[in-house]
């Protein structure tokens, strides 16, 4: 293995092509409802795409290139990753893993506080050396050309990467698919992974004889998610290739497919831009568009969706945000996590903790890993 420095580049020709496609979008009719119950409303889809074509700042590549990035071949696949070393000599190694529809961009606001707490008003004893890879088929990692790249194989690749960087003892953190990969990492490399911190504890609602009001609410939320919120995952887990033809060719389609999740999964007051700026939303959508990764990213659902809630035996920490997809109670979490050493319920935030509540997530990660330093 030999990591090579890497920078993200977006050409003017690529931007011009995107703008042309957006301006030529053939729109469907308006939805016959006055809410989001049928998906992204036409008016917002049109406004979002107008903004993307006319006044969006395409500088996400430059913001990402501020941090050291590399590519290396692991298990036959080119993997893109950020590797930000702390100025503190005793910093603790940590691998951060994003999910869908996220990317390594979501970590830009937490990299500084995690790697250099002294410069951000924190305790230098909490410093981390951070490695943040792009999942296979996501961002600037290669797209697998064969099956088999599920969460376990990805976890093994992450362990190989960490060892190649000289880290024989490290922690793992993630949300969404990052939570599944981080949990799997604790299982495949228990001799090196001291603990895993997750900001998505995907746990089946418990069936207790004495459920609390919060547990009953979680059960109802689970039922509602199954009824109205699983369409995207059913498609991605069964027909990712078919879906990809539309999303890879139509930026409006790609934007709508992702933006709807920033409404459904964030702590907002009815509109995604209550929780995230339009710039942030379009940054994340742009990663998928410019890397043409709609299809390859969806294949992770085909590979591993049935294994998302596998038992976790590694020392674990769970931070529960109130508008996340699942919000287990402590005893519900104990049904999946057999060595749960940190459990906190936060007052604000949703599925995208690093984007919505970066300061909160940093504090949670610092607190959990103090147990292992």
Give the positions of each predicted feature.
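Glycine-rich "HGGG/HGxG" loop immediately N-terminal to the catalytic nucleophile
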Residues: 58-60, 122, 126, 135-149, ...
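Non-catalytic accessory segments flanking enzyme active sites
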Residues: 14-86, 90, 280, 289, ...
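C-terminal subdomain of alpha/beta-hydrolase-fold enzymes, centered on the catalytic histidine
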Residues: 236-373
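Conserved hydrolase catalytic core segment
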Residues: 113-120, 127, 167-217
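Conserved HGGG/HGGXW glycine-rich cap/lid loop of the alpha/beta-hydrolase fold
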Residues: 87-140, 369
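Alpha/beta-hydrolase
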Residues: 1-16, 21-22, 26, 194-286
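Conserved acidic catalytic loop of the alpha/beta-hydrolase fold
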Residues: 152-170
């Amino acid at each position: 293995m030999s990591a090579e420095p890497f920078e993200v580049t977006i050409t003017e020709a690529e931007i011009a092509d995107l703008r042309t496609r957006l301006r030529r979008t053939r729109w469907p009719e308006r939805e016959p409802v006055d809410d989001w119950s049928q998906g992204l409303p036409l008016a917002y889809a049109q406004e979002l795409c107008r903004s993307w074509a006319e006044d969006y700042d395409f500088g996400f590549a430059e913001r990402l290139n501020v941090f050291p990035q590399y590519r290396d071949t692991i298990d036959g696949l080119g993997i893109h990753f950020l590797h930000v070393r702390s100025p503190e000599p005793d910093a603790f190694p940590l691998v951060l893993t994003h999910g869908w529809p996220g990317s390594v961009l979501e970590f830009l606001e937490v990299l500084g506080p995690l790697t250099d707490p002294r410069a951000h008003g924190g305790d230098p004893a909490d410093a981390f050396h951070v490695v943040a890879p792009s999942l296979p088929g996501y961002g600037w990692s290669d797209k697998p050309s064969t099956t088999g790249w599920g969460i376990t194989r990805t976890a093994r690749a992450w362990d190989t990467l960490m060892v190649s960087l000289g880290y024989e003892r490290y922690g793992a953190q993630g949300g969404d698919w990052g939570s599944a990969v981080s949990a799997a990492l604790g299982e495949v490399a228990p001799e090196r992974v001291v603990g895993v911190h997750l900001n998505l504890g995907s746990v089946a609602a418990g069936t207790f004889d004495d459920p609390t009001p919060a547990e009953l609410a979680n059960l109802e939320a689970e039922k509602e998610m199954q009824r109205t919120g699983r369409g995207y995952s059913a498609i991605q887990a069964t027909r990712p290739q078919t879906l990809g033809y539309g999303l890879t060719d139509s930026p409006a389609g790609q934007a709508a497919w992702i933006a709807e999740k920033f409404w459904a999964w964030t702590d907002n007051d009815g509109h995604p831009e209550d929780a995230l700026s339009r710039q942030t939303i379009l940054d994340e959508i742009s990663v998928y568009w410019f890397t043409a990764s709609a299809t390859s990213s969806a294949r992770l659902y085909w590979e591993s969706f049935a294994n998302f809630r596998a038992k976790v035996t590694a020392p674990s920490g769970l931070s529960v945000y109130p508008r996340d997809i699942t919000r287990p109670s402590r005893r519900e979490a104990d049904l999946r996590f057999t060595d749960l050493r940190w459990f906190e319920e936060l007052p604000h935030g949703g599925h995208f903790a690093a984007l919505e509540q970066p300061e909160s997530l940093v504090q949670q990660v610092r607190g959990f890993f103090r147990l292992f330093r």
